[in-house]
Amino acid sequence: MALRFTLTLLLVTILVAAILLGSSEAAYRKPPFNGSIFGKRNSLDYDSAKMSAVCEVAMEACPMWFPQNDSK
């Protein structure tokens, strides 16, 4: 009887531990790689060029899509 109780308690303990470890693993996130081997890349140089290209396209396209009536 004591052996059966001990085995049941051991099985329940293992199941609870497996459930708790599974839920704690879901919260873990690996840090981003960021090119630590090859050096870090600076995206600030590219951001201004991309933004100016987007603004240029918007300034050309918006007047065609939304014409302004200057009859004020």
Swiss-Prot record:
Phenotypic effect of disruption: RNAi-mediated knockdown in SIFa-expressing neurons causes normal male sexual activity towards virgin females but also vigorous courtship directed at other males and also leads to female hyper-receptivity with a dramatic decrease in copulation time. It also causes reduced sleep and shortened sleep bout length.
Gene Ontology terms, MF aspect: hormone activity; neuropeptide hormone activity; neuropeptide receptor binding; receptor ligand activity
Localization in the cell: Secreted
Propeptide residues, chain positions: 42-72
GO biological process: mating behavior, sex discrimination; negative regulation of female receptivity; neuropeptide signaling pathway; positive regulation of circadian sleep/wake cycle, sleep; regulation of circadian rhythm
GO cellular component: extracellular space
Main location: secreted
Residue numbers carrying Phenylalanine amide: 38
Record's keyword terms, sorted: Amidation, Behavior, Glycoprotein, Neuropeptide, Secreted, Signal
Tissue expression remark: Strongly expressed in two pairs of neurons in the pars intercerebralis (at protein level).
Signal peptide: 1-26
Glycosylated residue positions: 34
Task performed by this protein: Ligand for the neuropeptide SIFamide receptor. Modulates sexual behavior by negatively regulating female receptivity to male courtship and by playing a role in male sex discrimination. Also involved in promoting sleep.
Family under the similarity heading: Belongs to the FARP (FMRFamide related peptide) family.
Protein known as: Neuropeptide SIFamide
UniProt organism field: Drosophila melanogaster
Source species taxonomy: Eukaryota, Metazoa, Ecdysozoa, Arthropoda, Hexapoda
Name of the gene this protein is made from: SIFa
